[in-house]
């Protein structure tokens, strides 16, 4: 991975300590963990004696140092141009710093629900929402830069990269999922779609 770039790793609460340790040993600086509302509620495990898993854990880390890109993804609730604390910059129209918890209507969901999967005939146990990935990509990279996904599944990261004018490289071990990803990418490129949410 290039110096001064961001990385996002999707995980679970029980795997977080192991992944955190692996990332640090690989030379990443772990900045924090995003908790993003899923588009669905998980339904496996202890269904009567455990809380439903309705959040995706995403480890945010970097190699070197990189700041967030200025985007128009989310309007600031504070009035533009106001100075709320002495010595700090005046507020901007759009947020330049995002919360670590993405819940509610103003943020995209992390995954698609079963209705979306049925409508699109795309079934994957951990399919990610293209809009959510698009936000992460826009916050952390510039147009033309390379986005890599080592576990591309059905290609949501590729679609988000295409939609935000980034180069894309991915790997997938499962041939069936790889073929779905290829078909989704071809469909988007054929239609030259810029909004695939």
Question: Residue locations for each model-derived region?
Answer:
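Conserved SAM-binding loop
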Residues: 8-9, 170
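Short glycine-dipeptide loop
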Residues: 1-7, 13, 143-144
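Class I S-adenosyl-L-methionine
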Residues: 22-197
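Acceptor-substrate binding/catalytic loop of class I
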Residues: 9-14, 123-127
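Short, well-ordered alpha-helical microsegments
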Residues: 16-19
């Amino acid at each position: 991975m290039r110096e001064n770039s961001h990385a996002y790793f999707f995980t679970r609460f029980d795997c977080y300590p192991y992944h955190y340790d692996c990332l640090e040993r690989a030379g990443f600086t772990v900045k924090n963990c995003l908790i993003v509302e899923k588009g669905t509620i998980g339904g496996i495990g202890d269904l009567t004696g455990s809380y439903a898993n309705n959040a995706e854990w995403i480890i945010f880390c970097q190699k070197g140092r990189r700041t967030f890109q200025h985007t128009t993804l989310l309007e600031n609730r504070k009035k533009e141009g106001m100075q709320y604390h002495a010595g700090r910059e005046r507020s901007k129209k759009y947020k330049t710093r995002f919360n670590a918890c993405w819940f509610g209507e103003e943020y995209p969901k992390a995954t698609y629900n079963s209705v979306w999967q049925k409508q699109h005939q795309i079934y994957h146990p951990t399919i990610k929402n293209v809009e959510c990935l698009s936000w992460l990509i826009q916050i952390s990279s510039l147009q033309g830069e390379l986005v890599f996904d080592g576990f591309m599944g059905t290609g949501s990261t590729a679609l988000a990269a295409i939609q935000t004018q980034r180069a894309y490289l991915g790997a997938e071990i499962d041939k069936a999922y790889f073929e779905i990803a290829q078909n989704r990418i071809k469909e988007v490129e054929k239609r030259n779609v810029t909004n695939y949410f």
